[in-house]
Amino acid sequence: MKIMFVAAEGAPFAKTGGLGDVIGALPKSLVKNGHEVSVILPYYDVVDQAFGQQVEDVLYFYTQVGWRRQYVGIKKLVKDKVTFYFIDNQGYFFRGRIYGDWDDGERFAYFQLAAIEAMEKIGVIPDILHVHDYHTAMIPFLLKEKYHWIQAYQAIRTVFTIHNIAFQGQFDPGMLGDLFDVGIERYEDGTLRWHDCLNWMKAAVLYADRVTTVSPSYAHEIQTPAFGQGLDQVMRMEAGKLSGIVNGIDTDLFNPARDPHLPASFSAEDLSGKAATKQALQERLGLPVRADVPLIGMVSRLTDQKGFQLVLEELPHILQQDVQLVLLGTGDPDYEAAFSWFAKAYPEKLSANITFDLPLAQQIYGACDLFLMPSAFEPCGLSQMMAMRYGAIPIVHEIGGLKDTVASYNAYEKTGTGFGFDQFSGFWLTQTLLFALDIYHNHKEDWQTIQQHAMTKDFSWDTASLAYLDLYKSLL
């Protein structure tokens, strides 16, 4: 099977979040199953700086972005048996950042047109074309409405994955003619219209052969007004082709037995190194070195989506307990200031690290006994899976991917991989934390059982990719 991915970012070339992780890992896993996999990405300046000496120039051509005749350079790099093609246009992609420019609509309109036309130029016509988030969401529409006359493209089946429905790509409808060079009919008949805007994501949901989200629970949630961001009715209408597949994590990279960032290695069979890692982190951050105190970690963007309003609301109560908290992340300036204030007020209980530091993040996963992740909504989430791999037991709001990946502890059946609360409130966050602390202090055998279950749960991409393969095969 020939599978092609088109996305705005992908590790290790350019990455800002979970989308980049998926594009870095899923193709690599599919290749292991004997499939021919390629990826099309923009050739950003950050890619040029890090990989410019490794890529090869394949060809170039020109495409029409409305009335604009734009250069399209194709560069190529084979990595882990996956063929990466890069769309090169310095005017659009050498901006010092991936997103956030005033002309993002034009930039990604160009990228989608160039990617579609590049398939024929480089001679790679996939069986499955898998596009991701709004930046590539017009591709299924364009294949059926603009490029349908190209015979080689007529057998291509498209899959669209929603990583976060909040970012839909809403633009002025004049873009259809001005950039995509197609008629306005599909806007005027309501197909592409949403609140008097052209909505790229709506186009993908209606035109793609299959639509996926990054967890089964999120696939259900986006069909409701509470989580659908205005597209819930469209999601319900297209529910027959909507499904959720949980992201995996790179289990080679996130492995406490071989993590170079940890001062001591450990595994589910031998946890002695975890105690040494905990002591090293306490020393590094200036917390009292105590093996008996529960160490609670938080590694996250400091935003409302991640539930930090609940954490701040309950922090005075939580800090009355005999616990230590370690925070790592940046985000909303109000949250940054609040956690910094609490860290100064409680220097022996809270270490607030307002930065992004990958080695420190790995040490927090490795050192902590508990991991706090009370997100208001979470399409999938990766941190909770990483924490479990390192024996840090997650406390989560049971929503989206958190609900699908963390099984709440059952005291009677002795099952579960963490602790969860259903109601998004500070009260239930604190009650769940107190319950977890009781198990930690007073039921050591149960705690060790939870830790074993968490550390041995299979979150590998090899498992997740099989679900995608089943989906692809159903289309052929």
Swiss-Prot record:
Record bears the keyword Glycoprotein: no
Biological or metabolic pathway of the protein: Glycan biosynthesis; glycogen biosynthesis
UniProt key word Transit peptide: no
Catalytic activity: [(1->4)-alpha-D-glucosyl](n) + ADP-alpha-D-glucose = [(1->4)-alpha-D-glucosyl](n+1) + ADP + H(+)
Gene3D superfamilies for the chain: Glycogen Phosphorylase B (3.40.50.2000)
GO BP term, pick one: glycogen biosynthetic process
UniProt: ADP-alpha-D-glucose binding residues: K15
CDD domains for the chain: GT5_Glycogen_synthase_DULL1-like
Gene Ontology molecular-function annotations: alpha-1,4-glucan glucosyltransferase (ADP-glucose donor) activity; alpha-1,4-glucan glucosyltransferase (UDP-glucose donor) activity
Pfam families referenced in this protein's UniProt entry, alphabetically: Glyco_transf_5, Glycos_transf_1
Keywords associated with the record: Glycogen biosynthesis, Glycosyltransferase, Transferase
EC numbers on record: 2.4.1.21
Matches recorded under InterPro entries: Glyco_trans_1 (IPR001296), GS/SS (IPR011835), Starch_synth_cat_dom (IPR013534)
Superkingdom, natural source: Bacteria
The family this protein is said to belong to: Belongs to the glycosyltransferase 1 family. Bacterial/plant glycogen synthase subfamily.
Role this protein plays: Synthesizes alpha-1,4-glucan chains using ADP-glucose.
Protein's name in the database: Glycogen synthase
